[in-house]
Amino acid sequence: TWRAAERGTLVHPEGVHSRTARRLVDSWLDAAGRPAALELAPEQAAELLALAGVEVVPSVPVHDADEAVAAAQRLGWPVALKSTVPALRHRADLGGVRLDVHDAAELRADVAQVLALAAGHAPAPGRAPLEVQAMAPHGVATVVRSSEDPLFGPVLGFGLGGDTTDLLGDFAYAVTPLTDVDVADIVRAPRSAPRLFGYRGMPPLDVAALEDVLARVSVLADDLPEMLALELNPVVVAERGAYVLGCTVRVGAAARADGPRRALPG
């Protein structure tokens, strides 16, 4: 039965600086005039995640080919080129993402093509049209989400990347605080999870690194009710390591009705 099942111990990863994160979020909300909700700039989201021990792979916003080449030279080849246009973001199938770009000539050609594709779509407000990012090792793309429920607090979601996951609702959910057993269960719950464990002859991936990311996000979300929503997309799980390539965070006034129902007694 559920009560007899092994429930593990609450996760407490080292290097999660929740108090500092809360002060930082408060300063951003103050500077913005205390809006009901504020979407953080990418660099702010990365700074917040760093306080939880989660590193976002470096990227540079760019407007044109010259800026893109300069960014790639700073980051080191090869790089990825990504459109920030919402309709093309994360959409390699539509041409909005170009991977393993190895030199300036290839990058310039890709910039021209991606900008042409983006011309028919609404831009992302206040953002450069493109970003250049350091390449991460190849692996399986996953998505980590957290949303703040006024009654239950943070609800953590996990699934593999791609349209199929969203269309089929192949996501697993858990309410924080999480135990090590909860974290292991949420990674294994989606129907597509076997892709992380050596499916059809593929090498097993570094699930422990993915679980560490989930644990850190869960603790940050539990300690920071001002973090209304978070999405890490994608988190690429490789043979060694899990790499956060994109993050969006929305913050605002805390509205959590914390209580004993969020942590049932044993």
How does the language model describe each region?
Residues 1-266:
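ATP-dependent carboxylate/acyl-activation modules
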